[in-house]
């Protein structure tokens, strides 16, 4: 454990930030799973609706630095391609 006052403060801030990021990451994964489940069920309307909700969340997480912007772009691109491939 830290002995210096500033190090103690940084440790507290780091833990608080870690918990906040964990909840955001969990939320992002949940929305992605909803899109994937809708694609798997074959319901294009539901998949499109779920993707419309998940897309800005992915962008926001990339902007905040929670995930890399290329990872967000990759997820969006692949999900969009899967939805377009549905007949």
Curated annotation (Swiss-Prot):
Q: Which HAMAP family match?
A: Ribosomal_bS20
The record describes the protein's role as: Binds directly to 16S ribosomal RNA.
**Could you give one GO CC term from the UniProt record?**
cytosol
Going by the entry's taxonomy, the superkingdom of the source organism is recorded as: Bacteria
The organism named in the record is Aeromonas hydrophila subsp. hydrophila (strain ATCC 7966 / DSM 30187 / BCRC 13018 / CCUG 14551 / JCM 1027 / KCTC 2358 / NCIMB 9240 / NCTC 8049)
Example GO biological process? translation
**InterPro entries (UniProt xref):** Ribosomal_bS20, Ribosomal_bS20_sf
Entry keyword set: Ribonucleoprotein, Ribosomal protein, RNA-binding, rRNA-binding
UniProt lists the family membership as follows: Belongs to the bacterial ribosomal protein bS20 family.
Q: Where is this region: Disordered?
A: 1-27
- Could you state a single Gene Ontology molecular function term? structural constituent of ribosome
The identity of this protein, by name, is Small ribosomal subunit protein bS20
One Pfam family here:
Ribosomal_S20p
């Amino acid at each position: 454990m830290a002995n210096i006052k500033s190090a103690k403060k940084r440790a507290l801030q780091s833990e608080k930030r870690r918990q906040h990021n964990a909840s955001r990451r969990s939320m992002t994964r949940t929305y992605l799973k909803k899109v994937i489940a809708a694609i798997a069920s074959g319901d294009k309307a539901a998949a499109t609706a779920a993707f419309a909700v998940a897309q800005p969340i992915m962008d926001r997480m990339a902007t905040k630095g929670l995930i890399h912007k290329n990872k967000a772009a990759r997820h969006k691109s692949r999900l969009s391609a899967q939805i377009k491939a549905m007949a």
